[in-house]
């Protein structure tokens, strides 16, 4: 249970913003900043919702493919190169699941770089941002409601969408962290 929101930023690039609450069936903990991170070698920024273990394996064990605009279109790259790289890391660490004959994972992700972004869902389906924004996790509906359909959005707009999700969505809370494809550095909203 979480919320991660990515938007096309009015200042260029993509903003990725997340809450910091993690939970298990018996408790919750606020202040976990590792729902978002930067893969500095590839220039990707990534946000995750779901299993912490799955996110850790994807973060530290995935051999990220390099996107080259002259060789790939974005959906094809995501489906044929990124998804298999993630599946390979999960398989290697025993986290690739089979649900009624469909390979699954217990997390969802947003991956962004430059002006590009998409989400990978639990069944490895890839969703492209139709209106310049993507939200995942239990707070996604509140975030979409706060953003509306007309973008681009400032970083502050995206932070506000996550803040609103912390007020009403189950399993969303704690401090808010952000990263942009321009900066590749995680910051707390308190430090802005």
PLM regions: where:
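Long, charge-patterned amphipathic alpha-helical coiled-coil/hairpin "stalk" segments used as oligomerization
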Residues: 102-135
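C-terminal catalytic subdomain
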Residues: 163-170
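Conserved short S/T/G-enriched processing/targeting/catalytic segments and their helical context
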Residues: 1-96, 102, 127-159, 172-191
